[in-house]
């Protein structure tokens, strides 16, 4: 079974690794298509996609392609690889009709479709306080995440998970689902999605990390969803790190410092309160909340803004 894999971030790398390292010798990954290396960090040094790094470090015999687009030259390259399947996981590009014709294109998407079609499904699960998390395998078509479902897997939330932890758990679940889907592909009856029930999610931007002290639970959920990037910050760009939801019922003055101790600062919201372990001013290192507030001469009763 010859497979071309299309995927870019760490979520895709977990699934690519499972494909290559599984005990079924019938699977052969014959090529990786991934996004181009991109500038990263303050120095804007080029950073390779996680999938590319994994292949270079572990399976350098597998060819890597990083095209800007999927046009006729790339289509011919794909055809030349003679795939039985094209597996797509967080690739970052919509496949044109010419690619979809080459072989069945199976997409592993980090949501229970038709819920959360688009670029940030894991963020949306967290932000919407979902109690069931899951992944879907679908047969791709020309529209965004709208293809027929080949299978899905899910689990019931037992506690709050941040983006990194939930993504990793879903990636491993997606890998198991994909291997099963490939093995049983010819006996699976694809099921059309209920398009009327579809919801969509957008690409996350820096501005999404801006928060205020209105709703404690919303602030807490954003801290989980945006932990890796863009993190959460106030209008003065003060970052809030290590946020804990204390309660979500009482009403306080917006941003009122209720208590300061070694665990952090307890801050009131219009609804609820949160404890913040560390604070980070622009261009500075993170500090214990107590140390930061002492340096600013802020005390209980003052407003954190």
Swiss-Prot record:
* Similarity annotation: Belongs to the Fmt family.
CDD domains registered for this protein in UniProt: FMT_core_Met-tRNA-FMT_N, Met_tRNA_FMT_C
Specify the protein name: Methionyl-tRNA formyltransferase
What's its job?
Attaches a formyl group to the free amino group of methionyl-tRNA(fMet). The formyl group appears to play a dual role in the initiator identity of N-formylmethionyl-tRNA by promoting its recognition by IF2 and preventing the misappropriation of this tRNA by the elongation apparatus.
Query: Which GO terms fall under molecular function for this chain's record?
Result: methionyl-tRNA formyltransferase activity
Specify the domain of life of the species encoding this protein: Bacteria
Q: Which PANTHER family match?
A: METHIONYL-TRNA FORMYLTRANSFERASE (PTHR11138), METHIONYL-TRNA FORMYLTRANSFERASE, MITOCHONDRIAL (PTHR11138:SF5)
Q: Does the keyword Ribosomal protein apply?
A: no
Keywords carried by this UniProt record: Protein biosynthesis, Transferase
Q: Which reaction does it catalyse?
A: L-methionyl-tRNA(fMet) + (6R)-10-formyltetrahydrofolate = N-formyl-L-methionyl-tRNA(fMet) + (6S)-5,6,7,8-tetrahydrofolate + H(+)
Quote the EC number. Answer: 2.1.2.9
Tell me if Nucleotide-binding is a UniProt keyword of this record.
Answer: no
GO cellular-component term (any)? cytosol
Among NCBIfam families, the record links this protein to:
fmt (TIGR00460)
Which Pfam family is one of those matched by this entry? Formyl_trans_N
For binding (6S)-5,6,7,8-tetrahydrofolate, which residues are annotated in this chain's numbering?
111-114
